């Protein structure tokens, strides 16, 4: 689950708890629980986060699931996404790809980019649903168009390999570049490979080396290997 602390702070502010109040975790918890028990979906989501993150209360995944579910059943996309993640990871509930898929889909249909990306990966890998590259492409595109760098990279991969769509190196390059410019190390490596092989763009070893170097800095070992190779060749 991404950015729990940021999500928690934002959720508490949305409930009207000011900086001085939500600095006190125990006070946050009491106030949030009171609102959650009154049926406030945002508070239910926030309470789920608090249990999930162990903020103001002892960490308890089962309680997190309980409160995420209450908010999710009221249509809260963030709670649907987090509930899907609990099922996906088997935290506080038995691991269940089909249930993860069901909740991700509900959040994705409301425009939640993270859920759209996860739905894409589940369609691509056949997790909780029959493998379907065309559906994977569809959901990756939705997330990519919202700026999700992981989705942009995966969309590029699908265009590069012709999965769910006709192979198109120019489109692959476009999406790799968008992700790479956001700092996505795997996309930086993939963009370097496109320049190295001349796929969708004129071959350029200097630019290839530059992107491999960025990927290396981001922790992609093969980027380091390719950077050293090109450096030895004098590029």
Tell where the protein language model's regions lie, with residue ranges.
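Bacterial N-terminal signal peptides that target proteins for export
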Residues: 1-9
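Bacterial N-terminal signal peptides
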Residues: 9-18
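Boundary at the C-terminal end of the N-terminal hydrophobic targeting segment
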Residues: 21-25
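Short helix-capping/linker turns of helical repeat alpha-solenoids
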Residues: 32, 37-40, 53-55, 60, ...
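Hydrophobic face of amphipathic alpha-helices that form TPR/SEL1-like repeat modules
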Residues: 46-53, 82-89, 118-125, 154-161, ...
């Amino acid at each position: 689950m991404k950015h729990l602390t940021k999500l928690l702070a934002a959720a508490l502010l949305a409930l009207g708890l000011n900086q001085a109040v939500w600095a006190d975790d125990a006070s946050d918890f009491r106030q949030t629980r009171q609102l959650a028990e009154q049926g406030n979906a945002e508070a239910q989501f926030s309470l789920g986060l608090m249990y999930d993150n162990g903020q103001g209360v002892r960490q308890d995944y089962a309680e997190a699931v309980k409160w995420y579910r209450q908010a999710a059943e009221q249509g809260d996309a963030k709670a649907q996404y987090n509930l899907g993640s609990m099922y996906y990871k088997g935290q506080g509930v038995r691991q269940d790809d089909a249930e993860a898929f069901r909740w991700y889909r509900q959040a994705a249909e409301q425009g939640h980019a993270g859920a759209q990306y996860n739905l894409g990966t589940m369609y691509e890998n056949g997790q909780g649903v029959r493998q379907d590259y065309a559906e994977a492409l569809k959901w990756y595109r939705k997330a990519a168009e919202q700026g999700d760098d992981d989705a942009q990279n995966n969309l590029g991969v699908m265009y590069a390999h012709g999965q769910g769509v006709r192979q198109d190196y120019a489109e692959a390059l476009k999406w790799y570049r968008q992700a790479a410019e956001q700092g996505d190390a795997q996309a930086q490596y993939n963009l370097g490979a496109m320049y190295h092989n001349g796929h969708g763009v004129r071959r350029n070893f200097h630019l290839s080396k530059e992107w491999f170097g960025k990927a290396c800095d981001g922790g992609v070992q093969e980027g380091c290997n390719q950077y050293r190779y090109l450096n030895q060749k004098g590029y």
